[in-house]
From Swiss-Prot:
This is Glutamate--tRNA ligase. Disulfide bonds: none annotated. It catalyses: tRNA(Glu) + L-glutamate + ATP = L-glutamyl-tRNA(Glu) + AMP + diphosphate. Transmembrane segments: none annotated. Its EC number is 6.1.1.17. GO terms for biological process: glutamyl-tRNA aminoacylation. GO terms for molecular function: ATP binding; glutamate-tRNA ligase activity; tRNA binding; zinc ion binding. Signal peptide: none annotated. Its main location: cytoplasm. Monomer.
Length: 469
């Protein structure tokens, strides 16, 4: 059996984490089986679909590196195909025209609600012999079976059954001639030879209707797998207040795509007790049967932990590629300073996100005229003048600018003055970084560079002289 899956978002908003997880699961299932993955944009809602949303979906998929074999297909470009199938169904009598007015349908709905019944179409036009002309307003409905049931073996939830008596005759073409979502999906899955439909559990009620239409068309019925929803850590449906933002917001906030993918794959799927998965491991181990039926809770702290792990365990060169985007957003020019891969190595332990890292690395590239007020008040006091002058002299005398020689200069200054490293290191840290926190002084001073470090020490000495005056 040829495995072929699809991700079919509606472009009415950003690609959120739930959609991204569904895309990932569909992608992994196809890649695990050596199959194909299709991207399809379900843009039949003409009023709500936007180009911005389409761009956001594409950006999110590309950032996550979820590549596709076919597409992107757009449903709005396939209306002729859908309508041709509907016209065929009218001829085959598996669909019929419904001329019921909005007023009649609304009255029917109100009466059913009053009687405690489930609102559904009563089939008034299903077998009507009333004469109507084609130019009268009408919709086209699918002639759903009235007996029996629809049973499908959900690959996550097991067998699910719906009585056909609970399913009314679905509208498949609107009054304006446009086909409806549920019908377009069926024709697309048929034409694109989709073998497995992996989607959110909110589509479970659509499945029996779509299966009945597929059977009426004589089309093969794909396998279905419905993924549970994602909850916030308070047990409620995930929303913006939980951080349910678009995927690209996670990029903007400094998360690596590898970390987000690792987090999303574990949000409902497991392989033993393993927490960290490379993309290759995900593809090797992923099965639909290992997806949990129950809802999963989104935990930002866990995502941050994973991101910190990836920052420190991925090759620094790869992390630096993503860091470059954040540095650019801050307008930091990196030509006259250390390579970004070295920044990753220097700041990786301290920073949980790349955004934090970009904000923290500015002093490696940009000079400053003022020091952090609290740090300067505490460490750039008159008593710090002698250690700074002494360490400056040793740093200026270095001919081979290496971290080891920088370390020896700082340690040698402390030894000669008979003071602890902190008496030299803390004033030096504030002098060269402008603040009270940084990685180790030897690697920090080395990365900043000899001339720039000496100039900043001179600025600090001038600051101290001002306090002495």
């Amino acid at each position: 059996m040829k495995i072929k899956t699809r991700f079919a978002p509606s472009p009415t908003g950003y690609l959120h984490v739930g959609g991204a997880r569904t895309a990932l699961y569909s992608w992994l299932f196809s890649r695990h089986a050596g199959g194909e993955f299709v991207l399809r944009i379900e843009d039949t809602d003409l009023e709500r679909s936007t180009q911005d949303a389409i761009d956001a979906i594409m950006d999110g998929m590309n950032w996550l590196n979820l590549d596709w074999n076919e597409g992107p297909y757009f449903q709005t470009k396939r209306f002729d195909r859908y309508n041709a199938v509907i016209d065929d169904m009218l001829v085959q009598d598996t669909a019929y025209k419904c001329y019921c007015s909005k007023e009649r349908l609304e009255a029917l709905r109100e009466k059913q609600m009053e009687n405690g019944e489930k609102p559904r179409y009563d089939g008034h036009c299903r077998d009507s012999q009333c004469s109507h002309t084609d130019d009268e307003p009408h919709v086209v409905r699918f002639r759903n079976p009235q007996e029996g049931s629809v049973i499908f073996d959900d690959k996550i939830r097991g067998p699910i059954e719906f009585s056909n008596q609970e399913l009314d005759d679905l509208i498949i073409r609107r009054t304006d001639g446009s086909p409806t979502y549920n019908f377009c999906v069926v024709v697309d899955d048929w034409d694109m030879e989709i073998s497995h439909v992996i989607r959110g559990e909110d589509h479970i009620n659509n499945t029996p209707r779509q299966i009945n239409i597929l059977k009426a068309l004589g089309a093969p019925v794909p396998e279905y797998a419905h993924v549970s929803m994602i909850l916030g850590d308070d047990g409620k449906k995930l929303s913006k207040r939980h951080g349910a933002v678009g995927v690209m917001q996670y990029r903007d906030d400094g998360y690596l795509p590898q970390a987000l993918l690792n987090y999303l794959v574990r949000l409902g799927w497991s392989h033993g007790d393993q927490e960290i998965f490379s993309i290759d491991e995900m593809k090797e181990f992923f099965t639909l049967e290992a997806i949990n039926k129950s809802a999963s809770a989104f935990n930002t702290e866990k995502l941050q932990w994973l991101n910190h792990h990836y920052i420190n365990h991925m090759p620094a060169e790869e992390v630096a590629v993503h860091l470059a985007w954040h540095v650019e957003q801050l307008g930091i020019e990196t030509r006259n300073g250390p390579e970004l891969k070295d920044i990753v190595k220097l700041l990786g332990e301290r920073c949980k996100t790349l955004k934090e890292m970009a904000e923290s690395c500015r002093y490696f590239y940009e000079d400053f005229s003022e020091f952090d007020a609290d740090a300067a008040k505490k460490h750039l006091r008159p008593v710090a003048r002698q250690p700074l002058e002494a360490v400056r002299a040793k740093l200026a005398a270095i001919t081979a600018w290496t971290p080891e020689n920088v370390h020896d200069a700082i340690q040698g200054t402390a030894d000669e003055l008979g003071v602890g490293m902190g008496k030299v290191g803390m004033p030096l840290r504030v002098a060269v970084t402008g603040a009270g926190q940084s990685p180790g002084m030897d690697v920090t001073v080395h990365a900043i560079g000899q001339n720039r470090s000496l100039q900043r020490i001179d600025l600090a000495l001038a600051y101290i002289a001002g306090r002495e005056a």
